[in-house]
């Protein structure tokens, strides 16, 4: 009999008990000493809610839009690689859950299901593609063309990964894909991270990135990508106001404030703490989103109050997959949705339009752990 899980932490604890250690460690871990990993979550507690009273919250409307597309709630699924390690259906289960709830899914380029397979599994789902810039630009171009062909609505280009962060658990575990899996969007065994290939004795993924991803990428490559497609493009991994302004200058359509789940450079700020700087920098010219550390409905409310249009969740989704596949993902999203609805109501917000910065203040006594 399956246990009763009622919050995101419950799902993680269950996943830890059922997933192979190397797979759980891959999903859970951050870079180096994991200071930023802890701070991504802890930082939300430094921001306190100041609710409004007597605002008639008998009915609440959670719906909003992301890059012009309607979603049932400002909680979307972020790019999480290789989801079939958590459940046999992987990304297909995730997109079906998103379709059921009316929210969006960002598909990782490193998915264990292809762009086409995910589109076929969730034909009515709002889908976006996360993109890396490969040394072979034709590989990148092909991914973009596949996304366009299959009805994906935007490209989220990752800008924080010229090399892979130093993830100690992956080094200790000599992380590789299980033998039956590969990255399905690539044809060659090297690009598909096939277990048949030799990726060394440390983190296989770090070796993969060193072989395949271009560390020389610059704003010139963003210009190239902007010319390549008419789809909206969002810069994923921005943590500075000047970089955000540069992204706007280069014609990008959004900023995803992200530290890659604290998996790249340890010691960077929690995303919720830098969100106000990014929002101020773009001056309303593009939409701003956030990922990193979102585990509760109050986290969503705080992010929106500080200017995010929506948040993206990653690890909670794979914990849901590990529990019960599509139903597990749906349950995780339903929990976050209901927690967010309750937080809105208890803060006097009938809809997301009335959520603003007057709802939150940073605790003056709080000190970052970094």
From Swiss-Prot:
Task performed by this protein: Broad substrate specificity (S)-2-hydroxy-acid oxidase that preferentially oxidizes glycolate. The glyoxylate produced by the oxidation of glycolate can then be utilized by alanine-glyoxylate aminotransferase for the peroxisomal synthesis of glycine; this pathway appears to be an important step for the detoxification of glyoxylate which, if allowed to accumulate, may be metabolized to oxalate with formation of kidney stones.
Organs and tissues of expression: Highly expressed in liver.
Compartments (UniProt record): Peroxisome matrix
Residues modified as Phosphoserine: 194, 230
Modulation of this protein's activity: Inhibited by its product oxalate. Inhibited by high concentrations of dichlorophenolindophenol (DCIP) in vitro.
GO biological process: fatty acid alpha-oxidation; glycine biosynthetic process; glycolate catabolic process; response to oxidative stress
PROSITE patterns assigned: FMN_HYDROXY_ACID_DH_1, FMN_HYDROXY_ACID_DH_2
Residue numbers binding FMN: 79-81, 108, 130, 158, 236, 258, 291-295, 314-315
GO MF annotation, one: FMN binding
Reaction(s) catalysed by this chain's protein: a (2S)-2-hydroxycarboxylate + O2 = a 2-oxocarboxylate + H2O2; glycolate + O2 = glyoxylate + H2O2; glyoxylate + O2 + H2O = oxalate + H2O2 + H(+); 2-hydroxyhexadecanoate + O2 = 2-oxohexadecanoate + H2O2
Quaternary context: Homotetramer.
Cellular component per GO, a single term: intracellular membrane-bounded organelle
Keywords, alphabetical: Amino-acid biosynthesis, Flavoprotein, FMN, Oxidoreductase, Peroxisome, Phosphoprotein
Gene3D superfamilies tied to this protein: Aldolase class I (3.20.20.70)
Motif range (Microbody targeting signal): 368-370
Pfam families: FMN_dh (PF01070)
Family, similarity comment: Belongs to the FMN-dependent alpha-hydroxy acid dehydrogenase family.
InterPro entries registered for this protein in UniProt: Aldolase_TIM (IPR013785), Alpha-hydoxy_acid_DH_FMN (IPR012133), FMN-dep_DH (IPR000262), FMN_HAD (IPR037396), FMN_hydac_DH_AS (IPR008259)
Primary location group: other
Protein's name in the database: 2-Hydroxyacid oxidase 1
Organism: Homo sapiens
Positions annotated to bind glyoxylate: 26, 132, 167, 260, 263
Every FMN hydroxy acid dehydrogenase domain range: 1-365
């Amino acid at each position: 009999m399956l246990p009763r899980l009622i919050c995101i932490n419950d799902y993680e604890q269950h996943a830890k008990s059922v997933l192979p250690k190397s797979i759980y460690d891959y999903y859970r871990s951050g870079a180096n000493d994991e200071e930023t990993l802890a701070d991504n979550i802890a930082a939300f507690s430094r921001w306190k809610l100041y609710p409004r009273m007597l605002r008639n919250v008998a009915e609440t409307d959670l719906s909003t839009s992301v890059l012009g597309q309607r979603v049932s709630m400002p909680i979307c699924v972020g790019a999480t690689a290789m989801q079939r390690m958590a459940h046999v259906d992987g990304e297909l289960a995730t997109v079906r859950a998103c379709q059921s709830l009316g929210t969006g899914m960002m598909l990782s380029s490193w998915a264990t299901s292809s762009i086409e397979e995910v589109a076929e599994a969730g034909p009515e789902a709002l889908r976006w593609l996360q993109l890396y810039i490969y040394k072979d630009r034709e590989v990148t171009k092909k991914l973009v063309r596949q996304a366009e062909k299959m009805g994906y609505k935007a490209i989220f280009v990752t800008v924080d990964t010229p090399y892979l962060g130093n993830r100690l658990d992956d080094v200790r575990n000599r992380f590789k894909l299980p033998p039956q899996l590969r990255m399905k969007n690539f044809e060659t065994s090297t690009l598909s991270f096939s277990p048949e290939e030799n990726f060394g004795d440390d983190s296989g993924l770090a070796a993969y990135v060193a072989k395949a991803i271009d560390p020389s990428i610059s704003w010139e490559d963003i210009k190239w990508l902007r010319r390549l497609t008419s789809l909206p493009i969002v810069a994923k991994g921005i943590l500075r106001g000047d970089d955000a302004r540069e992204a706007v200058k280069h014609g990008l359509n959004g900023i995803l404030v992200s530290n890659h789940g604290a998996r790249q450079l340890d010691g960077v700020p929690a995303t919720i703490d830098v969100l106000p700087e990014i929002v101020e920098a773009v001056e309303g010219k593009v939409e701003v989103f956030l990922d990193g550390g979102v585990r509760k409905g109050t986290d969503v409310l705080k992010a929106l109050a500080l200017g995010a249009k929506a948040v993206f969740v990653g690890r909670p989704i794979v914990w849901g997959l590990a529990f019960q596949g599509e139903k597990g993902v749906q349950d995780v999203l339903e929990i976050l949705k209901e927690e967010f609805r309750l937080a809105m109501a208890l803060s006097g917000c009938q809809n997301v339009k009335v959520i603003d910065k007057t709802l939150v203040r940073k605790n003056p006594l709080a000190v970052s752990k970094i």
